[in-house]
Amino acid sequence: GLWSVGVGFSERRLIDAAIRQMEKLPVSHSFAHRTHEPSIDLSEKLIKMAPAKFSKVFYTNSGSEANDTVVKLVWFYNNGRGRPQKKKIIARQRGYHGITIASGSLTGLPWNHRDFDLPIANILHAACPHHWRYAYDGETEEEFASRLAGQLEEMILHEGPDTVAAFIGEPVMGAGGVIVPPRTYWQKVQQVCRKYDVLVIADEVITGFGRTGKPFGCLTYDLEPDILVLSKQITSSYMPLAAILISDELYQGIADNSAKIGTLGHGFTTSGHPVALAVALENLKVIEERKLMENAATVGKRLQEKLRGFVDH
């Protein structure tokens, strides 16, 4: 799979979970304050796994839909707090966030833009944190990370901090080339974003649920995002599902604006599909019971040690 089948193919427990849920409640929407047991159970599980600041979950069917939703929620949030000009979102060159109109614009790969008239307005792209490819001669990883953080600050100041809403990135870039950033890169980026009231969005569609040896890539890099986007391995891709986690602060701003308007005019027929959520719950149980995240950390360390033996070849 595409960084997505964590428990392997033909896992009977996931198949049986889908069958049980189809027999019990095969479909149910989540509009008008409706919910169901799989939604409650999975949301509680995700909140327990995630960093402490996250308290609310919104479900979509894919990472592309999730990142589209994040763009809308960020705009909705800022409109609600009287900052309608705070719309611009900074992504990164070589980053990948999906292929719908907004998420495809966030993606920083030219073939996802060409002849699709992308990116749309208010989407910007900062430099890619690929030290081996883009560092100056003799520039250390620490110096490289500082330079990129400085460039990000310059971009925000050039655009106007009151117009920049968020910065989005994958903790480790996937489709752009499996690019591992310098160790302090994310801390420096976060410091700049906090300085200018810019939300930090961690796209963990690939890195979530153990790919970096911890539940989420943001934990690996000591990153404290405001929004967490999850998909792929949440169900080991046996069912289409993505989840957006936000903090109480963001939720309250969105809820207050929804109350003024009368509703939050966003959602999908199959948002929080009960079968997908039931499969996700069983999938996370399998990952935990078989200690797959711990195994990724152990095997990853051993792989690195062995690869270093070839450094002079």
Positions of PLM-derived features:
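Conserved N-terminal phosphate-binding loop of PLP-dependent enzymes in the Aspartate aminotransferase
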Residues: G1-H313
